């Protein structure tokens, strides 16, 4: 009710200043979208033209900056086909000094043009990207674009409101359809295509599938990118943008504080510094980052047939390893295990183990303290006897809901009020009480398959 009252007051205020009901609603919607977008775009969100749906679908600047670095080996202006509000286009414009953006919806195209005003060499067109023919789309200098970037729409409208959308999993229902993407790749144009990270491996084309007379040396690389630990996207790199001899890549991107940025970066690498304002916008669009990648020359199907890794279970004093989401989704678990000298727990399980601790940005390492009981009654007694008051529960391959199991195991000790008291007591400097806040991390999984499968659990310590 409080939000409704605020909305009514905002409408009344705008109406008193001469705005129509429709204009008032649009202004409020823009203000709300900008507020929500600040978590993704920072202070720049205050001046962006966007909708809530567009903000949700837009890429974080740090991920887009990483992609812009991937484009650098190829010369020419980037054509962003299906640019939306130009969140990607703006990063490419900041990095290269120019961009060509195409958007089907005229209103969204006008938003894109406004968001690209900082770049004099940016061009925005409203039209159907399927009408695009490589070589006919020109940049501000009258030259054909050199690179194509696409983010096919993977949502369709549901219900009466535009914001009510559902993701599509039929590639031919994308906008533009995936067949258009492949036909464009067959022209040989260097191209990057953003897809959802859940896109099936079997849907990723082999290089020979995009070979043609115009493209005699095709290349395809699939890269799963995670940002700040969360899986963000799959990018298919085609032709000159694909790394030679690489079929799959898992990448983790982490934004750095400004003070950790490379202060020796030459000014010419940051275009459009004609004014302090444009310079600030450019800096916000190109945040400093560090990226770590793991690559394989094999497709997932090829690796399944040829990569063999020993299987074993960790013993107390050894280490359980949890690969990063990008490693898991790219099906690079076995090859990654080989590279760090680890074993698989099971051929179908994304946990690893090692006799020694492993320090690597693409894996979380836990020391195995002990195996724990699996019967919930016994487990609850064990938790009580150990005096644990907070539990982190991790699982793979078992039908456990961590939040529900945690509540049952801890009982009243796991309530918010109890946790606050325990933390206050643990942080007390009076010395009158012993700390009572005792956290623990539990891991549950299933080994084997069918009748031979069994559940197993460990008490572990994060390193």
Regions found by a protein language model. Name each.
Residues 2-7:
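Short, small-residue-biased leader/transition segments that mark boundaries at the very start
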Residues 8-43:
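N-terminal, Lys/Arg-enriched amphipathic/low-complexity engagement segments
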Residues 75-84:
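Conserved class I S-adenosyl-L-methionine
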């Amino acid at each position: 009710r409080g939000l409704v009252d605020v909305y009514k007051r905002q409408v009344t205020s705008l109406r008193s200043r001469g705005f129509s009901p429709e204009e008032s609603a649009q202004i409020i919607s823009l203000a709300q979208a900008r507020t929500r977008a600040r978590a993704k775009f920072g202070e720049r969100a205050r001046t962006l033209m966007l909708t809530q749906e567009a903000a949700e679908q837009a890429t974080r600047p740090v991920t887009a900056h990483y992609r812009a670095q991937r484009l650098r080996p190829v010369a020419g202006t980037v054509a962003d086909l299906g640019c939306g509000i130009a969140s990607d286009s703006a990063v490419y414009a900041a990095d290269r000094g120019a961009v060509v953006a195409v958007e089907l919806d005229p209103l969204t195209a006008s938003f894109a043009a406004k968001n690209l005003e900082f770049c004099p060499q940016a061009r925005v067109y409203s039209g159907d990207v399927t009408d695009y023919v490589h070589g006919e789309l020109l940049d501000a200098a009258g030259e054909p674009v050199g690179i194509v970037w696409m983010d096919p729409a993977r949502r369709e409208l549901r219900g009466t409101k535009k914001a009510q959308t559902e993701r599509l999993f039929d590639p031919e229902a994308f906008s533009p359809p995936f067949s258009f993407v492949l036909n464009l790749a067959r022209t040989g144009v260097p191209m990057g295509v953003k897809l959802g990270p859940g896109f099936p491996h079997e849907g990723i084309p082999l290089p020979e599938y995009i070979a043609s007379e115009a493209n005699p040396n095709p290349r395809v690389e699939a890269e799963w990118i995670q940002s700040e630990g969360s899986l963000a996207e799959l990018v298919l790199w085609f032709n000159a943008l694909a790394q030679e001899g690489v079929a799959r890549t898992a990448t983790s991107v982490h934004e750095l504080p400004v003070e950790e940025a490379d202060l020796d970066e030459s000014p010419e690498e940051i275009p459009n510094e004609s004014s302090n304002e444009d310079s600030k916008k450019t800096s916000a669009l190109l945040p400093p980052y560090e990226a770590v990648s793991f690559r394989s020359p094999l497709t997932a199907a090829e690796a399944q047939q040829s990569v063999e890794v020993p299987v074993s279970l960790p013993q107390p004093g050894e280490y359980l390893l949890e690969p990063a989401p990008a490693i898991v989704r790219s099906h690079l678990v076995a090859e990654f295990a080989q590279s760090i000298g680890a074993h698989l727990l099971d051929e179908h399980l994304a946990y690893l183990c090692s006799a020694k601790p492993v320090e690597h940005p693409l894996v979380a390492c836990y020391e195995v303290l002990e195996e724990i009981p699996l019967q919930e009654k016994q487990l609850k007694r064990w938790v009580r006897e150990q005096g644990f008051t907070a539990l982190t529960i991790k699982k793979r391959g078992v039908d456990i809901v961590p939040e529900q199991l945690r509540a049952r195991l801890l009982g009243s000790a796991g309530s918010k009020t109890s946790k606050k008291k325990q933390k206050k007591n643990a942080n007390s400097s009076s010395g009158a009480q012993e700390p009572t806040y005792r956290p623990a991390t539990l891991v549950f999984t299933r080994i084997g398959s069918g009748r031979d499968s069994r559940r197993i659990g460990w008490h572990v310590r994060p390193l």
